[in-house]
Amino acid sequence: VKATLIDFDDSFTYNLVQDLEETGFSVTVLSWTDFEELPSSGLLVLGPGPGHPDDYLRIYPLIEKWLSSKGPFFGVCLGHQIYWRLQGELVVRSKNPTHGQKMTLQLSREWSNWLGLDLKLVDVQRYNSLCVPAMTHPNPELKNLEQDGEIIITRGKNLLTYQFHPESVGTSYHMAFFRPLLKDLVY
């Protein structure tokens, strides 16, 4: 399966490429500054990167077009935030800015089963000052894992986003976070 990864000049980009390839994807990396047309098929990946999602407004129309076509979409950190900005949600300063530190996620049985893990807790590595606040009226077509008032994972039809770095060595069972890309998304 092909994947096009949009690189936002982040040092984790090629860690993400390696894990996507290990999952079974053939990955093409494209700088966000060169992103001018959508791939014809495959997975669109918005990787991590610096700044606020609105720093990348120029590419919003392309991403909106991809999302409206229901093409498979994967967002990591900044990619998670860009997805939510395109849904009209706020991206605000986190109450707990975290850079290079582990966060322990509490998993319900549903989330644990979805990841294929028989665990109630899993560590994820975070590098973010910004977050998407938890919602009072969430979209019923999406499932959000929320913790400490922030959306940490979003999944839906042909959609998966993480507000952490699944490709980081600080994320335990990190490949479990990539398996849903083949299991749940339609190509």
Regions found by a protein language model. Name each.
Residues 1-2, 187:
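Short, low-complexity, intrinsically disordered N-terminal peptides in bacterial proteins
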Residues 2-3, 10-75, 87:
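Flexible gly/pro-rich beta->alpha loop and the following alpha-helix that scaffold active-site loops
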Residues 15-18, 57-58, 78, 137, ...:
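Generic recognition of short, well-ordered alpha-helical segments
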Residues 48-52, 79-81, 167:
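Short glycine-rich anion-binding loops that position phosphate/pyrophosphate groups of nucleotides
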Residues 59-63, 94, 177:
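A general structural detector for well-ordered alpha-helical segments in enzyme core domains, enriched
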Residues 65, 74, 81-159, 164-173:
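Pocket-forming structural segment of enzyme catalytic cores
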Residues 166-187:
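Acyltransferase
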